[in-house]
């Protein structure tokens, strides 16, 4: 059974900043169970290196890396080997799933076109959010999207 944690519309206008530094979704969501979060990233426009596609560090999802707070909203992950970073370019309408502990980032859009996407984050319905959860939403308010409620 799955609960919806967060659904985000992501928009990178042409020739703008909008880079999101390395992070792991598990760091934000603060779930009491390992391997409980999965995220789906859907490209509405062509997502290329130049337009700010998703980058991942393969194999680095086996641990939760330390993060530091940034002045702007968010965190930056520390310590992972960025030399293995891989861009995941997607055509419009394509999607990718990633584990909640997969380190990922997006860079600025330097093209003449927007780069829009939708990120949908799910968690195991038997898991619970911990105090300090980024969204601070009670689990009972998270809709069940597959299966039955854990109670």
List PLM regions with ranges.
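Short, solvent-exposed aromatic-acidic interface loops
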Residues: 10, 59-62, 140
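A structural signal for short, well-ordered beta-strand segments
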Residues: 7-9, 40-42, 118-122
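Short acidic-glycine-tyrosine-enriched beta hairpin
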Residues: 84-97
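Non-heme Fe(II)/2-oxoglutarate
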Residues: 69-70, 95-97, 101-151
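A structure-centric signal for secondary-structure junctions around beta-strands
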Residues: 6, 37, 51, 114-117
């Amino acid at each position: 059974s799955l609960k919806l944690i967060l659904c985000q519309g992501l928009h990178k206008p042409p020739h703008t900043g909008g880079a999101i530094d390395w992070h792991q979704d598990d760091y934000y969501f603060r779930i009491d169970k390992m391997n409980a979060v999965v995220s789906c990233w859907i490209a509405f426009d062509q997502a290329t290196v130049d337009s700010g596609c998703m980058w991942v560090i393969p194999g680095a999802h086996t641990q939760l890396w330390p993060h530091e707070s940034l002045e702007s909203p968010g965190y930056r992950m520390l310590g992972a080997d960025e030399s293995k970073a891989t861009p995941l370019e997607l055509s419009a309408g394509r999607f990718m799933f990633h584990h909640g502990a997969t380190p990922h980032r997006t860079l600025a859009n330097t093209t003449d076109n927007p780069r829009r996407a939708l990120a949908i984050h799910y968690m195991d319905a038997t898991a619970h959010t911990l105090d300090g959860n980024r969204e601070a939403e009670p689990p009972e308010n998270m809709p069940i999207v597959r299966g039955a409620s854990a109670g």
